[in-house]
A protein has these predicted regions:
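N-terminal accessory/pre-domain segments preceding catalytic cores
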Residues: 17-173
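Bacterial Sec-dependent N-terminal signal peptides
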Residues: 1-24
Length: 173
């Protein structure tokens, strides 16, 4: 029974992959070992027809991941640990301080580029999509924002190349 389930799951995944656009396929191929994480997001929103807009949103995000990255490596890890010691520093001030190494060439040489497409985790992306949809559908200031504008302006999980962060949690009630 378990073997049949695995085979069925593999066939469904293989079939659904064949329905992907060439752009999405190219991004999934480029993602390397992180492909499974991205496919988890697509699978998550492929289960229920009520999630069809969320599936389109997840495809939009994944297709647009190439070129988006953050910096990592031992220096950044140490820097973030030091930043974590600032217990009473407001969230937004910490975010500004966190960006300092990105703006100085001397620091940048000590940092590794971590491309979203190769590092982002499914749980993070699903969480961001859920909160974005919740904010889009429940906030009065979003009235009249259609899906295309939502995707472009409200859905993205980052602004530039700042570290990946659960920033939406800081503005959710």
């Amino acid at each position: 029974m378990k073997k049949k389930t695995i085979i069925l799951l593999w066939l469904v995944t293989a079939y659904s992959c064949s329905n992907y656009s060439s752009r999405l396929k190219a991004v999934l191929d480029y993602s390397g070992t992180n492909r499974a994480e991205l496919e988890k997001v697509l699978d998550h929103y492929s289960q229920d027809p009520a999630d069809s807009l969320k599936l389109k949103a997840s495809i939009f995000l994944i297709e647009n991941m190439p070129g988006h990255y953050t910096f990592g490596g031992p220096y950044m890890k140490s820097y973030n640990e030091q930043l974590g010691l600032l217990k009473n520093c407001p969230y937004y001030e910490k975010k500004i301080i966190q960006m300092v190494p990105f703006d100085h060439i001397g620091y940048r040489q000590q940092l590794d580029i971590q491309e979203d497409v190769k590092y982002i985790k499914a749980d993070f992306l699903i969480h961001q999509i859920e909160l974005a949809f919740n904010q889009w559908q429940t906030r009065p200031w979003n009235e009249g924002v259609d899906f295309e504008n939502f995707k472009e302006y409200l859905l993205p999980y980052r602004v530039e190349n700042e570290p990946l962060d659960y920033w939406r949690d800081s503005i959710s009630p």
